[in-house]
A protein has these predicted regions:
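Metal-ion/cofactor- or nucleotide/acyl-coenzyme-handling active-site neighborhoods
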Residues: 1-233
Length: 233
């Protein structure tokens, strides 16, 4: 996903970069220089067979990722870059807020690239095996865990970043909530999680079940407090 490398990390992540899913905010950051563009789009050793750019909250009439993709594909003939359609992104957004059971107008939270990648996989794969993704309760079960958020840098730890993001009531990514939704989808869509295994942590819930996560509880408390303050005033 995004700019995650394989070089020097082959023992953990392998060498395949068949598909690379990139968020629209990361796309221009990854393509600033000709060297970077060749790395992702042209070099046989490092380019992906297919680059998928998903874009959320963009102006569809002034869609800069679409322009960049056309330019890069005209320069690098081996590059294959696809953009998620407006219809697909609206569907993804509806699924996101529907699973959260929250009105979009009430918050400024957004989908992660992991969410976009999972939905891409659901669209194109018959079965899905996911490696290296922790389940919703992993951090509470491993309070001393110090694994980094990105395997290729040590800027911050995964669990601390997830927890702080989850506690932000009205903005940011909701990584643990997304993972709770993936656990719900596992049986529905044939998703299998490895390293760590999610056995014993799958929700086995119905299609209409709304997940109850740290973010959902935090948001519910916020709404109740706001309603209480409104009543008092």
């Amino acid at each position: 996903m995004n700019g995650a490398p394989t070089a020097t990390y082959e023992a953990d992540v392998g060498t395949k970069t068949t598909y690379r899913v990139i968020g629209h905010r990361n796309f221009p950051r990854m393509m600033k220089t000709m060297k970077e563009r060749r790395h992702y789009l042209d070099d046989e050793a490092t380019r992906s067979d297919l680059v998928v750019v998903w874009h959320y909250g963009v102006n569809w009439k002034k869609n800069s990722p679409a322009r960049w993709s056309k330019v890069f594909c005209s320069i690098f003939k081996k590059a294959t870059v696809y953009l998620a359609s407006e219809t697909a992104m609206k569907r993804n957004e509806e699924m996101f807020y529907g699973e959260l059971d929250i009105q979009k107008s009430k918050v400024k939270i957004w989908m992660s690239t992991g969410w976009g990648t999972m939905l891409f996989a659901l669209d194109v794969c018959e079965t899905i095996d996911v490696y290296g993704m922790i389940y919703e309760d992993y951090c509470s079960e491993h309070p001393n865990d110090t694994y980094s958020y990105h395997y290729f840098d040590k800027a911050r730890t995964e669990c601390s970043y997830y927890a702080s993001s989850e506690r932000q009531t009205l903005k940011g990514h909701k990584f643990l909530t997304e993972k709770a939704i993936f656990a719900k989808w596992a049986a529905m869509y044939g998703i299998v999680f490895h390293e760590p295994s999610w056995d014993g942590h799958l929700k086995n819930s119905g299609n209409d079940t709304v997940v109850d996560t740290l973010f959902k509880r935090t948001f519910r408390d916020y709404e109740e407090q706001r309603e209480s303050n409104s009543t008092k005033s």
